[in-house]
Swiss-Prot record:
The chain crosses the membrane at residues 29-49, 58-78, 103-123, 137-157, 200-220, 241-261, 275-295. It comes from the Eukaryota. Keywords: Cell membrane, Disulfide bond, G-protein coupled receptor, Glycoprotein, Membrane, Olfaction, Receptor, Sensory transduction, Transducer, Transmembrane, Transmembrane helix. Residues 1-28, 79-102, 158-199, 262-274 are extracellular. Pfam families: 7tm_4. Its main location: membrane. InterPro entries: GPCR_Rhodpsn, GPCR_Rhodpsn_7TM, Olfact_rcpt. Belongs to the G-protein coupled receptor 1 family. This is Olfactory receptor 5P76. GO terms for molecular function: G protein-coupled receptor activity; olfactory receptor activity. One of its GO terms (biological process) is G protein-coupled receptor signaling pathway. Disulfide bonds join 100-192.
Amino acid sequence: MAFLEDGNHTAVTGFILLGLTDDPVLRVVLFVIILCIYLVTVSGNLSTILLIRVSSQLHHPMYFFLSHLASADIGYSSSVTPNMLVNFLVERNTISYLGCGIQLGSAVFFGTVECFLLAAMAYDRFIAICSPLLYSNKMSTQVCVQLLVGSYIGGFLNASSFTLSFFSLVFCGPNRVNHFFCDFAPLVKLSCSDVSVPAVVPSFTAGSIIIVTIFVIAVSYIYILITILKMRSTEGRQKAFSTCTSHLTAVTLFYGTITFIYVMPKSSYSTDQNKVVSVFYMVVVPMLNPLIYSLRNKEIKGALKRQLAKNTFS
C-alpha cells in the first residue's frame, strides 16, 4: 500500500523510485556496470582498511583517518547502491516511508563524515609539512580520536537535520520520486505541506559543513604551498608534494561533485544531470578513493608489496 486514508486526506506510506532509466536494455547494462563498481568499492576499501591495520608502517594519523575514510566510503555507497541495483531488476521499485527516511539519513551521515575526514586529513598534512617538529604533539592519538569523534558527531547532527525535516513533511499526493534514491530535494517537491522551514534547515546545516570543511582544506593547503615554495631542496619539495597529491585528488573529486549538487543554482542543471552527478559522487568516487591512494602513495604501495611478499613466502 502506497497510500493510507487518514481523516480528510490521504497519507503516503511509501514511495516509487523512478531510477535512472526506463530503457530495459540500458537497465541491464547499468546493472552490470554498477554491480562491478560496487564490488570493487567494497573489496578495495576493505583491503585498504585491512592493510592499514596489519602494516605497522602505516600506523600514523594520516592512515588512521584514511582507514575511517574507507569505512565511510563503504557505508556511503552501500546506503544507495543495493537499492539502485534492485531498481534495475524490477519494473517498479518501491520503498517504505520509514525506509526512505533511513536511506536519506544514512547517505547524509556517511557523506558528512567523509567531508570532516577529508578536512582532518588536510589539517594532518598541514601540521606534518608546516610544523614537523610539533607533529607528534599536535597529532597525538588523543587529538586524532577527538577529530574522528567530531566527524561522526557532525555526521549524526547533519543526518538528524535531514531526517527530522523529512519526517516533518506531509505527503498526500504523488509518491513517485524522480531519482534512484530518497534524495531530499525531490522529496520536498512531493510534499503537500509548508516546506519553508523543513527545506531551509538541512540546506543551512549542509551548506555550513561544506563551507567550513572547504575553508579548513583551502587554508591548510595555502600554508602547505607557501611552506613548500620556501624549501630549498628540490627533493624535499617533491616529497612534500607527493604526500598531498592523493588527498588533493580525492578532495577535488568529492567536493567538485557535491558543490555541483548542493551549491549551484537548481535552475542551472536538469534532474537527469543531477542523477548522473549523484551516481558519480555516491557510487564512482567511493570506488576511486582506494585506487587513488594505492596508486599515488609510496607508503601504501610499499606496505602492499611487503604484505604480498610475506603471504607469498609464508
